[in-house]
Regions:
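A short tyrosine-centered beta-strand micro-motif
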Residues: 1-2, 124
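Active-site- and interface-proximal helix/loop "cap" or "latch" segments in soluble metabolic
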Residues: 5-119, 127-246
Length: 246
């Protein structure tokens, strides 16, 4: 059983998350938001009503949906984003990914997220271990004076060449989606630095790039993980053993 918890409450709640692995499979996902008394947000009828009125869904529904989706998908990236609860879904995916990484390493220490802490200066980096369609993600983020000053997200092949320079891929994707890696990779890096410069800035503030929705969600997921590392000041490179299904 692998556990993760946020240390700090936001709007009266913090996330707690427990994942059980049996015979190499995720058999149970218990993600929740609890208050200081340990009461679940799913039981907060007032919150449920006001959120439902605004976005058509409340914690009672989306928390269960996310847990079910995770067990079904057996991966963080496969979790369906719940309409009306995009931010919660992205946060869930980030934490699910961190639990999977802990499980791959067999590390059952509770992961503590110092959410909202001032970012510590340094360079934080993450990379995927496996190529998918010939490319894997590399991502580094620089923090100076508590602010994100630089974002270097890229997709590179085995020779370290960027997807941005793959003219064939660029023209193919542009035809289909109206945008290619040359554009969206740069846009995501720029948007991230901008989003983090806002008051209470977070990766969730990154706008989805039309035509590159999947890449945007993956970017936000990894950006959140780098921000969590910076909140703690942990500059160890994060290696994501992204499971590439054949």
């Amino acid at each position: 059983t692998y556990k993760l918890e946020e240390k700090n409450e936001k709007n009266g709640y913090r996330a707690v998350f427990e994942m059980t692995v049996k015979d190499g499979k995720i058999t149970e996902s218990k993600y929740d938001n609890i208050n200081a008394d340990g009461k679940s947000k799913t039981e907060d009828t007032k919150y449920e009503e006001s959120m439902k009125a605004k976005s058509g869904v409340g914690p009672k529904e989306y928390i269960k949906q996310l847990n079910d989706s995770f067990v079904k998908a057996q991966s963080a990236s496969g979790v369906e984003v719940v309409t009306g609860a995009t931010h919660s879904s992205e946060s869930f995916q980030n934490y699910a990914q961190q639990l999977i990484q802990a499980a791959q390493a067999g590390n059952t220490d509770t992961i503590e997220i110092d959410n909202g802490a001032t970012l510590k200066d340094g360079t934080y980096s993450l990379k995927e271990k496996n190529d998918s369609n010939g490319y894997h993600t590399t991502f580094s983020m620089t923090v100076k004076d508590g602010k994100v000053t630089e974002s270097n997200y890229d997709n590179v092949n085995a020779d370290g060449k960027s997807k941005k320079d793959d003219t064939e891929y660029e023209s193919k994707m542009k035809d289909v989606a109206g945008v290619g890696p040359k554009e969206y990779i740069e846009t995501l890096n720029k948007e991230f630095v901008k989003a983090m410069g806002e008051e209470d800035g977070s990766p969730a503030g990154v706008e989805v790039v039309t035509g590159a929705t999947h890449s945007t969600h993956s970017f936000i997921n990894y950006a959140q993980q780098l921000v969590n590392a910076a909140e703690k000041g942990d500059t160890t490179e994060i290696v994501v053993d992204n499971i590439v299904t054949k």
